[in-house]
């Protein structure tokens, strides 16, 4: 008998051990309803997969039988749940979690969920809300709660399969009926509540409904993990539900929870689902329609088009739609198209003479892509975007989002092209992470409620969820806000990436159109673009000491201006036209007497004195301190002007000392092309510079040592820009 007894005992132990190996979560099933795979559903699945939940989606492929945006509905969810529970009704150990999916995400795993469910000591636990819905008349029938939320929420509940089967057994309603009202009436019936054994998650230990509780919920960063913390009850909910107006807050939380972004790891999902373009030849690249919008007077439009041309994307796979609202920019647009329009697959221009409204033009651009099935992407770019990264388009395509914008900010400011949150009336509100995203302390791909100025939209999205031909009208909102409101209404996510610096936004606040070349005045508002357009590309080499010549003792020669800077400064002066007479009487200067007169126009005559001083401070002062060690300058000046030399007007300049500590003399046109002769001779050293280079400046000491003269111009017209610095 003993051997048989031992075998029986061993078998019992093995069976017990096998049961002990079974994980509690093996008896957990998550049911949800999703009639189509929206971005919200994919987010729900991703958070569930992170914690290894078993999920079954009900209703995929069905029509949703309630009109979007209506307050009632949800009966379809009850119908689908009732049918799904038929095969589980007798599984007493099976725990079923039922939750919405489009606006829900998991913050913790099955083990914690089941632990908290069992601690509730009820067979069915519903989420609880601060607000009663849909029938406020039922408020008095609710049991009084001393601590916690009082009202039932149908967006999430958990229970044993037999009890849930009893819960939905009486459902005979229509798909358009309210599921919340159905469950509420069962809960408010004391007999049914006791029979099914229902309670509410009053303190949000399992479920967190954001509606009516936005101020209670904050992010809690743990080591390598992010939770939502309820401050009112000091709880860490397992599921977060953000229905209705709180979806935007769920989107914000979903940028982090459960571990999509942490301080330790950064973005953990930014490289998921990418569309790689590596190794793809030009012929196989997707077709992109580029929409360009010039809606107001904008600086550096010519530079905008140059940057467009520098994109590393074949023009034969790009189509252009340009809406130019401004007569002021008509010549620049036409010049660009005349020179480069034929390089693109197609071009459509809507000019200022058409007088098309901003929203209508943007609708037209999007619709051109929508109606053409070969249009894979629509790339909308406003003219105030400085797209400085040539790989911008490829990088955005690579992220593989329906709608995505790159972060763009204004120079030195927190102003950007996205909002991290919206106020109650739908306007700007600053999210907790806004500054960190703008300043690059948090880097990733962010789900945000508002983008503008530049974005990439998939053509398939325009032909699908965004198929409305009027995306840019919504109530009385401006086109940018209307666009975002319409996208949010379709439950399409708008993403913002700050993984790469693709460019910046121009400041338009102080832009004026009263000059011939208005960009010259933008050195304060848009210094980066001013530098790109007007400062010589080799200036940085000169600053590093690699491109500085010394043609005469203590005379330095280095590049400073671009060809464009030289041309525009000359044209601006000629456009102004009030050249001095070149005699000693000069009312423009203190005392009214000029000892060494030239035919010139002063910078202050064209309102350019502040801008010129900024130029001297930013670009001349650093060179001075390098070339004359120990001397530091604030680049003060009394005289800064453009001189014109002509054989029949004033061909040369008599020997003189400059009234300065040092002088700069910038050649504004080309010897041998625009004029002959000219140059500068330093008499004490018997040293002449006879072939000044356009855009290069001479820098030399002024009074005392460098006695010099202007050599005769024998043909054409010579222009130079001169400053007497630190007089």
UniProtKB/Swiss-Prot annotation:
Stretches assigned to the Fe2OG dioxygenase domain: 636-727
Compartment annotation: Rough endoplasmic reticulum membrane
GO cellular component: catalytic complex; collagen-containing extracellular matrix; endoplasmic reticulum; endoplasmic reticulum membrane; extracellular exosome; extracellular space; Golgi apparatus; rough endoplasmic reticulum membrane
Residues bearing carbohydrate: 163, 197, 538, 686
Required cofactor(s): Fe(2+); L-ascorbate
Catalytic activity: L-lysyl-[collagen] + 2-oxoglutarate + O2 = (5R)-5-hydroxy-L-lysyl-[collagen] + succinate + CO2
Protein name: Procollagen-lysine,2-oxoglutarate 5-dioxygenase 1
Matching InterPro entries: Collagen_mod_GT25 (IPR050757), IPNS-like_FE2OG_OXY (IPR044861), Nucleotide-diphossugar_trans (IPR029044), Oxoglu/Fe-dep_dioxygenase_dom (IPR005123), Pro_4_hyd_alph (IPR006620), Procol_lys_dOase (IPR001006)
Pfam families hit by this protein: 2OG-FeII_Oxy, GT_PLOD, OGFOD2-like
């Amino acid at each position: 008998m003993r051997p048989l007894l031992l075998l029986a005992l061993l078998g019992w132990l093995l069976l017990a051990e096998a049961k002990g190996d079974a994980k509690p979560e093996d008896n957990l099933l998550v049911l949800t309803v999703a009639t189509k795979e929206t971005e919200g559903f994919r987010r729900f699945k991703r958070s569930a997969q992170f914690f290894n939940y078993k999920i079954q989606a009900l209703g995929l492929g069905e029509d949703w039988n309630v009109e979007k945006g209506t307050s009632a509905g949800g009966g379809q969810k009850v119908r689908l749940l009732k049918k799904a529970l038929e095969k589980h009704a007798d599984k007493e150990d099976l725990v079923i979690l039922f939750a919405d999916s489009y606006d829900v995400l998991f913050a913790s795993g099955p083990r914690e969920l089941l632990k908290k469910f069992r601690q509730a000591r009820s067979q069915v636990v519903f989420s609880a809300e601060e607000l009663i819905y849909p029938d406020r008349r039922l408020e008095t029938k609710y049991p009084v709660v001393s601590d916690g939320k009082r009202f039932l929420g149908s967006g999430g509940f958990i229970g044993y399969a037999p009890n849930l089967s009893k819960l939905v057994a009486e459902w005979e309603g229509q798909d358009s009926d309210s599921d919340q009202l159905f469950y509420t009436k069962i809960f408010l019936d004391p007999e049914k509540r006791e029979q099914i054994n229902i309670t509410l998650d009053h303190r949000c230990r399992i479920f967190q409904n954001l509606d009516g509780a936005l101020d209670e919920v904050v992010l809690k960063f743990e080591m390598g993990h992010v939770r939502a913390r309820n401050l009112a009850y000091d709880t860490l909910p397992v599921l977060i539900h953000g229905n209705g107006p709180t979806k935007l807050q769920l989107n914000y939380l979903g940028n982090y929870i459960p571990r999509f972004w942490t301080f330790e790891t950064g973005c953990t999902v930014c490289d998921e689902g990418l569309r790689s373009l590596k190794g793809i030849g030009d012929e196989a690249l997707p077709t992109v329609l580029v929409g360009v919008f010039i809606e107001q007077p904008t600086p550096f439009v010519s530079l905008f088009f140059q940057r467009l041309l520098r994109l590393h994307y074949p023009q034969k796979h790009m189509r252009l739609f340009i809406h130019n609202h401004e007569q002021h920019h008509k010549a620049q647009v036409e010049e660009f198209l005349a020179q480069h329009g034929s390089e693109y697959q197609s071009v459509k221009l809507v000019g200022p003479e058409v007088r098309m409204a901003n929203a209508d033009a943007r609708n037209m651009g999007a619709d051109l892509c929508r109606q053409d099935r070969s249009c894979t992407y629509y790339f909308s770019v406003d003219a105030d975007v400085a797209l400085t990264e040539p790989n911008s388009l490829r990088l955005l395509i690579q992220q593989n989002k329906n709608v995505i914008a790159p972060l763009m900010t204004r120079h030195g400011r927190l102003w950007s092209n996205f909002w991290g949150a919206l106020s109650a009336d739908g306007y700007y509100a600053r999210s907790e992470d806004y500054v960190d995203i703008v300043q690059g302390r948090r880097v990733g791909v962010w789900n945000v409620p508002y983008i503008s100025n530049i974005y990439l939209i998939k053509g398939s999205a325009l032909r699908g969820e965004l198929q409305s031909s009027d995306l840019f009208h919504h109530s009385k909102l401006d086109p940018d806000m209307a666009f975002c409101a319409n996208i949010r209404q379709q439950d399409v996510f708008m993403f913002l990436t700050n993984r790469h610096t693709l460019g910046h936004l121009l400041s338009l606040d102080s832009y004026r159109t009263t000059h011939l070349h208005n960009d010259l005045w933008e050195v304060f508002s848009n210094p980066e673009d001013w530098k790109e357009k007007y400062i010589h590309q080799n200036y940085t080499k000169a600053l590093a000491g690699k491109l500085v010549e010394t043609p005469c003792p203590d005379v330095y020669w280095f590049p400073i201006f671009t060809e464009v800077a030289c041309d525009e400064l000359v044209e601006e002066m000629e456009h102004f036209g009030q050249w001095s007479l070149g005699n000693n009487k000069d009312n423009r200067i203190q005392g009214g007497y000029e000892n060494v007169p030239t035919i010139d126009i002063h910078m202050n005559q064209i309102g350019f004195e502040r801008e010129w001083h900024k130029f001297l401070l930013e670009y001349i002062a650093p060179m001075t301190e390098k070339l004359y060690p120990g001397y530091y300058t604030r680049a003060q000046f009394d005289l800064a002007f453009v001189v014109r030399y002509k054989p029949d007007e004033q061909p040369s300049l008599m020997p003189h000392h400059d009234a300065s500590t040092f002088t700069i003399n910038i050649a504004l046109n080309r010897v041998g092309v625009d004029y002959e002769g000219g140059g500068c001779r330093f008499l004490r050293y018997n040293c002449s510079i006879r072939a000044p280079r356009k855009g290069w400046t001479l820098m030399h000491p002024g009074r005392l040592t460098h006695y010099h003269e202007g050599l005769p111009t024998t043909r054409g017209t010579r222009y130079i820009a001169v400053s007497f610095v630190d007089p």
